[in-house]
């Protein structure tokens, strides 16, 4: 059976934005998985995985979340892994890159607004731009939601972005 995994650090993100996509995947024969730090029941999700994500990227607990996510990716063969939210996006792509099943899954990342943008501080650019540029090599498809992010993503030299 085909499998898709949605990753976000909080379940509210999935509940507010991705239920139609989970339903479409289910309707097309996919087993749907969601990895978040919550326990609320998510419609159209066959299997939920509680990962101890923390909102702050500097929180030490995110190291544990990385290991939990990598274990999940090693134990389950996913066809598609779709990462969301800043922490979910970073940890999801890194865990995939360090998993034994990375040759199987295609990894998607939806940038719901980069932290570096025209009016962002220099610190945001110094911190977040290099991280996203580095992680681009672990991204098969990057989806952006605004023109400025699309323009910035072109500098990452990805093979696919929208």
What role is predicted for each listed range?
Residues 83-89, 111:
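Short His-centered aromatic/hydrophobic patch
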Residues 16-17, 60-67, 106, 116-134:
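Nucleotide-sugar donor phosphate/pyrophosphate-binding loop at the beta->alpha transition
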Residues 23-28, 67-70, 125-142:
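Membrane-proximal helix-turn-helix segments that form the acceptor-binding/catalytic region
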Residues 24-64, 71-75, 160-161:
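Conserved nucleotide-sugar phosphate-binding/catalytic loop shared by glycosyltransferases and other
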Residues 3-5, 97-115, 132, 143:
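Active-site proximal beta-strand in glycosyltransferases
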Residues 40, 87-88, 148-150:
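Alpha-helix capping/helix-boundary segments
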Residues 138-162:
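A short, active-site helix/loop in glycosyltransferases that binds the activated sugar's phosphate group
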Residues 1-37:
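N-terminal subdomain of nucleotide-sugar transferases
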């Amino acid at each position: 059976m085909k499998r898709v995994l949605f990753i976000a650090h909080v379940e509210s993100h999935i509940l507010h934005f991705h239920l139609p996509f989970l339903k479409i995947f289910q309707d097309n024969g996919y087993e749907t998985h969601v990895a978040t730090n919550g326990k609320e029941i998510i419609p159209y999700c066959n299997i939920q995985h509680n990962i101890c994500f923390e909102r702050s990227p500097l929180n030490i607990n995110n190291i544990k979340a990385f290991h939990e996510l990598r274990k999940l990716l090693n134990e389950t063969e996913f066809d598609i892994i779709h990462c969301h939210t800043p922490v979910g996006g970073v940890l999801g792509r890194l865990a995939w890159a360090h998993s034994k099943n990375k040759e199987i899954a295609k990894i998607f990342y939806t940038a719901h607004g980069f932290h570096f943008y025209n009016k962002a501080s220099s610190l945001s650019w110094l911190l977040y731009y290099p991280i996203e540029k580095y992680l681009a090599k672990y991204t098969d498809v990057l989806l952006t939601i605004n023109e400025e992010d699309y323009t910035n993503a072109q500098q990452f030299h990805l093979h696919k972005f929208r």
